[in-house]
């Protein structure tokens, strides 16, 4: 059954946990979707895990749309959420609505996600008014990595925690259907989760959030350039993939692959005509 923003709200109301993962292509989206995930985020994290960049800042709207199209074809039941990249909504309300609309109309997303608190409330309201569901994002917002001075936990002081709580309430009032809380102290995330009526999706924010999200390469052990503290690796596919590829290389080198069962045959009579 197709997950919707109503499904997410129903889960929160009933105390059921929401599960989300990232995806960027058809094949992986299909596997994730068939596993029963509630939501898939086409994250600007693709800048790091797909493009090999050091951060997410270079990702463009067109790149998000391209990957959203691929994910959409593979995921039939998950809620599809597309990240709004750096500077795709910051410059003006009009630009924010235009780019959000492109992700829905051209990419096929069900919703968009954007980072920030009080500074982006006008954008959130305008996008919601355009009938586009919005997921907020507070805490460690990767697009603000330069402003934060690196990838650091947020909300550790009383002042910073109060600001996060207030921002969460503002985002809810603006009409967002959910909020991602990234790298926020567990107790602060718990307070936010209790004080707002929309779902919170945690990533490095403890288990009191209404749901969780991870980058699939992280949780499957496929990306070892950097492993965040909040990641649990449920498999070590990177090592398994390298081993499989090395076996393939060895079999090609010794001529044991392909075998007859991997090859096609020609009728013996037709073959004789070639000599």
Curated annotation (Swiss-Prot):
EC number: 2.1.2.11
Any GO CC annotation of this UniProt entry: cytoplasm
EC class of the enzyme, as a word: transferase
Cofactor(s) for this UniProt protein: Mg(2+)
Cofactor notes: Binds 1 Mg(2+) ion per subunit.
Active site residues according to the UniProt entry: 182 (proton acceptor)
Binding annotation for 3-methyl-2-oxobutanoate: 44-45, 83, 113
Molecular function GO terms recorded: 3-methyl-2-oxobutanoate hydroxymethyltransferase activity; magnesium ion binding
Family, as annotated: Belongs to the PanB family.
Role: Catalyzes the reversible reaction in which hydroxymethyl group from 5,10-methylenetetrahydrofolate is transferred onto alpha-ketoisovalerate to form ketopantoate.
Protein name: 3-methyl-2-oxobutanoate hydroxymethyltransferase
Species name: Clostridium botulinum (strain Alaska E43 / Type E3)
Source species taxonomy: Bacteria, Bacillati, Bacillota, Clostridia, Eubacteriales
